[in-house]
Amino acid sequence: TDGHQAAAPQVGDPQAGEAKANGVCLACHGPQGNSLVPIWPKLAGQHPEYIVKQLMDFKQRRANEQMTPMAMPLTDQEVLDLAAYYATQPKTPGAADPELASKGESLYRWGNPETGVPACSGCHGPAGGAGQSLAKFPRLSAQHADYTKQTLEHFRGALRANDPNGMMRGAAARLSDQEIAAVSQYLQGLSQ
């Protein structure tokens, strides 16, 4: 060997994460990461890599009046612990407006070729429950429609810019208000 050892992978402790979540995150993100307030995201069942990315972004570069002050005091280990905890929690199902969800499903699965909107399923999986953990693309199924709508509007207006290579900003810039509402409802109704 050349005398260099590979760094051990950093792993979170779900039990420590639960204690931290119950003390700091519970008020907004709800029991087990299932927010009861539709403008705050559900964290239950989310990829740990995505949660780590978001918390580190809040600590380092993503200004948000609610989350930045909450994330700043977290140690790197606490971030890993929270991510490990939330990843193991079951998410509560959502219900969708059937008419909007039907329109949203088409957009999610196939995009809108006329306006250049790519299919959401290409990155977030065929049913919104997979995402791609290594790429840090989130799971979207059962997420609150209000939160998803707000997030897409923030990407569209470049109020949120922590997406790799501007991928979400580029896709959201082509979405109409009606398309945002429809895909948000569709995702809220997915149970995977």
From Swiss-Prot:
Primary site of residence: periplasm
Instruction: Identify the InterPro entries for this entry.
Output: Cyt_c-like_dom (IPR009056), Cyt_c-like_dom_sf (IPR036909), Cyt_C_IC (IPR008168), Cytochrome_c4-like (IPR024167), Cytochrome_c_Oxidase_Subunit (IPR050597)
Domain of life here?
A: Bacteria
Gene Ontology terms describing biological process: electron transport chain; heme transport
Record Gene3D superfamilies: Cytochrome c-like domain
**Where is it located?**
Periplasm
- Provide this UniProt record's keywords sorted from A to Z: Electron transport, Heme, Iron, Metal-binding, Periplasm, Repeat, Transport
Annotated ranges, domain Cytochrome c = 12-90, 99-191
Which Gene Ontology molecular-function terms are recorded?
Answer: electron transfer activity; heme binding; iron ion binding
Q: Name one Pfam family in it.
A: Cytochrom_C
PTM remark: Binds 2 heme c groups covalently per subunit.
State its role. Diheme, high potential cytochrome c believed to be an intermediate electron donor in an anaerobic electron transport chain.
- Show the PANTHER family listed in the entry: CBB3-TYPE CYTOCHROME C OXIDASE SUBUNIT FIXP, CYTOCHROME C4
**Name listed for the protein in its UniProt record:** Cytochrome c4
- Can you name the source organism? Thiocapsa roseopersicina
Q: What is the lineage of its organism?
A: Bacteria, Pseudomonadati, Pseudomonadota, Gammaproteobacteria, Chromatiales
